[in-house]
A protein has these predicted regions:
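Sec-dependent signal peptide recognition
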Residues: 10-16
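Intrinsically disordered, low-complexity sequence elements enriched in Ser/Thr/Gly/Pro
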Residues: 8-9, 27
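Feature activates predominantly on carbohydrate-active enzymes
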Residues: 98-221
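A periodicity- and composition-biased signal for non-globular, repetitive helical segments
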Residues: 16-17, 194
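Short, linear, compositionally biased motifs with a strong N-terminal bias
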Residues: 18-19, 211
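Short, Lys/Arg-enriched N-terminal segments with co-localized hydrophobic residues
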Residues: 1-8
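Acidic, contiguous N-terminal accessory segments
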Residues: 18, 24-154
Length: 221
């Protein structure tokens, strides 16, 4: 029996070693964010977002749209009941902070998350990072993150001229673009030689774009 026990332990040892390695790797795993930030340092503890107070500083007027996005973090998550907390989420707009365009700095502590950017786009993208970091209960790991885009144009194309999609699909497409911090939506609406769709906000699309006087084979005049 002693020999059998020794043999069994020898067989179990590789499995135990693999499990220990996996646990250690999971503990050291960096933040899983898309796209990967320029700098990210994980800290001990977490920030409980549900029930937190959202405040904004440095804006010319109350940023209602950004506060709506932040409120998704403050809302109850999963089956957790609404709870009262003194935790705060600060959105701080500071053009003198030296942060590149569309970039942000994020500091998450146990009772306060502070998001700073030089423009509103940076605040928005920082909120997308917080949404990615939150677990099913709305807990966000404490961390310090600095991020800004390498490219000014980060786009995605959608062709609805040849392939038709419902409105809800297009809205979901835009939501996923925002989550990935893409900032240009290339909407392929028509394959006609002239622009046919009237959009009142952009009248020159039809005033100018619907007409042309010349083509490769001569003039229409």
């Amino acid at each position: 029996p002693a020999g059998q026990n020794t043999c069994a332990m020898k067989k179990l040892f590789p499995l135990i070693a693999v499990l220990a390695t996996l646990c250690a790797t999971a503990a050291q795993r960096p933040l899983q964010l898309i796209p990967q930030p320029v700098r990210a340092e994980l800290r001990e503890g977490h920030f409980a977002a549900p029930g937190c107070k959202v405040t904004a500083e440095g804006f010319a007027s109350r940023p209602e749209g950004l506060i709506r996005v932040a409120s998704a973090l403050a809302a109850p998550h999963g089956k957790q009941p609404a709870r009262k907390t003194r935790n705060t989420l600060l959105l701080q707009l500071d053009a003198r902070a030296g942060i590149p365009a569309e970039g942000y700095r994020l500091r998450v502590a146990e009772h306060e998350a502070e998001l700073t950017a030089g423009d509103e786009s940076g605040i928005f993208y920082g909120l997308q990072t917080l949404l990615q970091m939150a677990d099913a209960d709305g807990n966000i790991p404490c961390a310090e993150i600095e991020d800004y885009p390498r490219y000014g144009y980060r786009g995605l194309h959608l062709d609805v001229c040849r392939h038709f999609f419902p409105v809800e699909f297009v809205k979901g497409y835009l939501d996923r673009m925002a989550a990935a911090k893409l900032n240009r939506f290339h909407w392929h609406l028509t394959d006609d030689q002239g622009w046919r769709i009237e959009i009142k906000r952009y009248p020159r699309l039809t005033q100018v774009g619907a007409w042309r006087s010349k083509s490769q084979i001569g003039s229409y005049e």
